[in-house]
Swiss-Prot record:
Key word Zinc present: no
Organism annotation: Saccharolobus solfataricus (strain ATCC 35092 / DSM 1617 / JCM 11322 / P2)
Sorted UniProt keywords: Isomerase, Purine biosynthesis
TM helices/strands, residue ranges: none
Protein name: N5-carboxyaminoimidazole ribonucleotide mutase
EC number: 5.4.99.18
Family under the similarity heading: Belongs to the AIR carboxylase family. Class I subfamily.
Top EC class of this enzyme: isomerase
GO biological process: 'de novo' IMP biosynthetic process
Pathway: Purine metabolism; IMP biosynthesis via de novo pathway; 5-amino-1-(5-phospho-D-ribosyl)imidazole-4-carboxylate from 5-amino-1-(5-phospho-D-ribosyl)imidazole (N5-CAIR route): step 2/2
SMART domains: AIRC
Amino acid sequence: MPKVAVIMGSKNDWEYMREAVEILKQFGIDYEARVVSAHRTPEFMMQYAKEAEKRGIEVIIAGAGGAAHLPGMVASLTSLPVIGVPIPSKNLNGLDSLLSIVQMPYGVPVATVAIGGAKNAALLAIRILGIKYKELADKIKKFSEDMRNDVLSTRLEA
């Protein structure tokens, strides 16, 4: 049963959102990935968000570009944690998406990562799951330690 839902506003967003899926796979986390458009399939989006918890989903990663309403709309329909990933856009390089996702009204929180930051969205989802699942907490700690050790062992030659 998937623990993480990776959703996006269009299939074009998959270019960025697949990076979240790769991280989830690396950590052995069951997930589902699909297009859920806030504008083209609003009824489906509402049903999807409302039923996610019943289906065993524990964290939702939602990527969207442009107006980027998907993360906020999903967050308004569920009590699950929602992580928004602003997708780079043609006109404003994703700044429009970032501002849309990060400026949520009181009571509808969306954790927001950097523009195109699907990898960090997955890592944040793993940290959230690590509160409940000790094995994931241990894996994310090891991941962070390995990154730290890689940096500390780096030697530069002139």
